[in-house]
Amino acid sequence: MTIRSLPAALSPLSMAVQAVLLVSSLALAPAANAKPVTWEDIANDHLNTQNVLQYGMGTNAQRWSPLAMVNDKNVFKLTPAWSYSFGDERQRGQESQAIINDGVIYVTGSYSRVFALDAKTGRRLWTYNHRLPDNIRPCCDVVNRGAAIFGDKIYFGTLDARVIALNKDTGKVVWNKKFGDHSAGYTMTGAPTLIKDQKSGKVLLIHGSSGDEFGVVGQLYARDPETGEEVWMRPFVEGHMGRLNGKDSTPTGDVKAPSWPDDPTTETGKVESWSHGGGAPWQSASFDPETNTIIVGAGNPGPWNTWARTSKDGNPHDFDSLYTSGQVGVDPTTGEVKWFYQHTPNDAWDFSGNNELVLFDYKDKDGKQYKATAHADRNGFFYVVDRTNGKLKNAFPFVDNITWASHIDLKTGRPVENEGQRPAKPLPGETKGKPVEVSPPFLGGKNWNPMAYSQDTGLFYVPANHWKEEYWTEEVNYKKGSAYLGIGFRIKRMYEDHVGSLRAMDPTTGKVVWEHNERLPLWAGVLATKGNLVFTGTGDGYFKAFNAKTGEELWKFQTGSGIVSPPITWEQDGEQYIGVTVGYGGAVPLWGGDMAELTKPVAQGGSFWVFKIPAWDTKTAKR
């Protein structure tokens, strides 16, 4: 089957479905009355074992817990404590990382829903169901990846391009801000991030936008968490104008945008693609208080077709399509770009740059230490970047058989591309270019699903995939609300025995320390703990625990539907709990070609599972 446009499942939602998407706040129990969250709580989230307040389990996004009550010696005793069903017919992909504060879990669901649950029992405290219009345009399923919390409010984004604040105890709407035209493709699927500007002392709510596949211009926002009012907005296409306090501020990069071709026949003086250039920061940001820097990934350029972003008869290597498919350091006071590192210049394959940016202390082969970001890109390369200035320190492949580039030049920071891997223009008189086989495909060596870093082993645990793809160019013109790709594609198998591969990577040597292969693609995030454990989920519904040092599979549990979310862990009343959202969906079954066929037998679902060692047997057991 040739895929040339967005899946039918992502057309405007039917009136029948929308009829049941009612705004509600069901007070099925007394108000949660959890403690208000302070900035100090958020700043110490990575150290606090009782709460999980940020996406990434801390502003450093390491997904590392110092808890060890559940460990490699007793993890085989894990049993379900409870499970909560999201209910009704609204299933699809459940990609949410839950957060927890003072014994209350807040987890988002598909179709822009939020649930507040008692962390001990799973009892529902309240539910918020957002009313969605018919003409939303999510590219990659009706997912939501999580909420944020500060003070007495819960914050999350919606598929109709809104960011909403709810009272954390009742689920009532406090404020609701529209930031983009959803009919043009603007959405919000990522979890917002709370940061504190070290210069002004103000706490800010940071969120991005989605919609690169529809020709939006990606934008990063800072808001007052109390009122929702915009403080600043920064676009991620070179030459587009930012805002500060409601007024135009500065353009992003050079106002003349030399990384995008000129076209004197247009109103802007630039090629059409510049006006619809993508770069959407749809994943959650990280924050480095030491350098007072927001660090976030920028999405793919629009359209995918590299020739639409290259001058007539020009060379794609002369036009990098800034500031797309890379990582950006942003000043929280003004929204200005402090630094930018591009993983894939003039990205021709939709590799994007949105995968998480993990903050860690990197020690190079000579023993010199740097404050760094770690990033496993969809293009198949793992990057270590100095987060004080955006300079590349190390890069190496984390998946097999990368075809589009031979390596990353550590001196220039640029990929060394292999000839013939950019899909060629159609020949004269033809509407489609000659197909070219590329690996990884646009779904990536790893996609949005976040890796974890262990402070004990010094390893990154990367949920990777091995697959490949045929690409070919097609004619492309912008039309509001329609897919803006200019590329056709089909994803294919690389190996017969597996697609997914959980890999433990050494960031200094680039070596694979261990790997565990899975038959289906890996689309779940990873959690690492001081108990020498690594947790993740599989496409066929298993929640698994591995020995962090050796990769030995120690425990698994069948949840009933595929897992495409990041797990969390916390301590309550002297016991360690592990929780994970369950429900198969996301991009793979919608865009995945042969992979969609492979995953057809997986049942949909929507639930949150919690595990612990039974109270009657909490002593460390000998195996």
UniProtKB/Swiss-Prot annotation:
Catalytic activity: a primary alcohol + 2 Fe(III)-[cytochrome c] = an aldehyde + 2 Fe(II)-[cytochrome c] + 2 H(+); ethanol + 2 Fe(III)-[cytochrome c] = acetaldehyde + 2 Fe(II)-[cytochrome c] + 2 H(+); ethanol + A = acetaldehyde + AH2; 1-propanol + 2 Fe(III)-[cytochrome c] = propanal + 2 Fe(II)-[cytochrome c] + 2 H(+)
Upregulating conditions: Induced by ethanol, and to a lesser extent, by 1-propanol and other alcohols. Repressed by lactate, acetate and tricarboxylic acid cycle intermediates such as citrate and succinate. Up-regulated by exaE and agmR.
GO terms assigned for molecular function: alcohol dehydrogenase (cytochrome c) activity; calcium ion binding
Signal peptide per UniProt: 1-34
Subcellular location: Periplasm
Active site residues according to the UniProt entry: 350
Entry cofactors: pyrroloquinoline quinone; Ca(2+)
The enzyme's E.C. designation: 1.1.2.8
Binding site for Ca(2+) 2: 213, 300, 350
Protein residues bound to pyrroloquinoline quinone: 95, 145, 189, 207-209, 378, 523, 587
Pathway: Alcohol metabolism; ethanol degradation; acetate from ethanol: step 1/2
The WD repeat ranges on this chain: 515-556, 559-601
Pfam families to which the protein is assigned, alphabetical: PQQ
GO biological process, one term: ethanol catabolic process
InterPro entries: ADHI, PQQ_b-propeller_rpt, PQQ_MeOH/EtOH_DH, PQQ_rpt_dom, Quinoprotein_ADH-like_sf, Quinoprotein_DH_CS
Main location: periplasm
Similarity comment: Belongs to the bacterial PQQ dehydrogenase family.
Functional summary from the UniProt entry: Catalyzes the oxidation of ethanol and other primary alcohols to the corresponding aldehydes, except methanol, which is not a substrate. Uses a specific inducible cytochrome c550, encoded by the adjacent gene in the locus, as electron acceptor. Is a key enzyme of the carbon and energy metabolism during growth of P.putida on ethanol as the sole carbon and energy source. Displays lower activity on secondary alcohols, aldehydes and diols. Is not active with sugar alcohols such as glycerol and D-sorbitol.
Complex formation: Homodimer.
Protein name according to UniProt: Quinoprotein ethanol dehydrogenase
Native species: Pseudomonas putida
